[in-house]
């Protein structure tokens, strides 16, 4: 019952805070209150979750997907919306990473877990020898994840993209594709009938790092050969440089993406109740 009070006001919240037993627990609660509050706003703004949904969470084992998994499990348990969550992990690395932390976290959260072996990295790096492997790898991973989600009877797939991911994608599209584009908060896939949702889009990478550290989330270390050497990393460094000069730049860029009064790239995602 304690977690539920993080998202409400009044006496219940005051009783919850009074029940805290030490400063470390207080700090963890503060982090998760902020994360869950931002996720709730995003879900409500774009109508991401409905009663009866069965949501497959794509879990790589990194900080973003592990926090998403944890937050969605809490959301399921304490928000009064009846929906199901399951985790799907594609084991794509060369060498194969240790995904024990994913399985253990799922067991703790009472979330079904599928660890699916895959030859995606073999295809991308050893057969195709891609010079820019990220796009093909992402496409293959999305396809495999969606296929498993359909097989398991899921109607939605949740991905751990956060605010910085959206802004970096926007910059990539401008500078390398010559178009104004980023991924949508909600995407409906005609081929599979699935809906892809991104509940963490109102949360910064810095906030995710802080929450993952405070919650002591176990993280699977990436074994990707291209890690840290991508165009996306260039955009991350560029965005950091911009924000050193303009500290509010990230928030204003996010506001621009959803500015319905002028040109909102995400406007078509909103639905009237």
Where are these regions (language model features)?
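ATP-dependent adenylation/nucleotidyltransferase module used to activate substrates
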Residues: 9, 20, 24-168, 176, ...
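Short, hydrophobic-biased amphipathic alpha-helical segments
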Residues: 35, 231-234, 238, 245, ...
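Catalytic subdomain that performs nucleotidyl-dependent activation
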Residues: 85, 156, 164-244
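Short, solvent-exposed polar/charged micro-motifs at secondary-structure junctions
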Residues: 124-127, 231-232, 262-264
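A short, charged, Gly/Pro-tolerant segment at domain boundaries
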Residues: 248-273
């Amino acid at each position: 019952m304690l977690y539920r009070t993080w998202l409400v006001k009044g006496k219940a919240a005051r009783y919850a805070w009074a029940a805290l037993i030490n400063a470390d627990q207080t700090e963890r609660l503060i982090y998760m209150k902020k994360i869950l509050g931002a996720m709730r706003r995003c879900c409500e703004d774009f109508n991401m979750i409905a009663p009866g949904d069965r949501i497959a969470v794509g879990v790589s084992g990194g900080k973003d997907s592990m926090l998403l998994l944890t937050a969605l499990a809490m959301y399921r348990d304490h928000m009064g919306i009846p929906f199901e969550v399951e985790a799907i992990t594609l084991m794509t690395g060369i060498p194969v990473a240790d995904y024990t932390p994913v399985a253990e976290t799922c067991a703790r959260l009472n979330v079904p877990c599928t660890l699916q072996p895959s030859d995606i990295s073999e295809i991308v790096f050893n057969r195709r020898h891609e010079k820019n492997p990220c796009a093909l790898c992402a496409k293959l991973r999305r396809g495999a994840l969606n296929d498993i989600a359909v097989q398991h009877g899921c109607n939605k797939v949740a991905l751990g993209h956060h605010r910085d991911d959206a802004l970096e994608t926007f910059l990539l599209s401008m500078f390398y594709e010559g178009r104004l584009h980023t991924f949508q908060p909600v995407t409906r896939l005609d081929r599979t009938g699935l809906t892809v949702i991104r509940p963490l889009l109102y949360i910064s990478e810095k906030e995710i790092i802080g929450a993952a550290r405070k919650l002591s989330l176990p993280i699977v270390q990436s074994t990707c050969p291209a890690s840290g050497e991508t165009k996306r990393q260039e955009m991350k460094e560029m965005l950091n440089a911009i924000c050193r000069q303009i500290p509010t730049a990230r928030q204003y860029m996010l506001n621009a993406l959803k500015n319905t009064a002028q040109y909102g790239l995400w406007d078509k995602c909103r639905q009237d109740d």
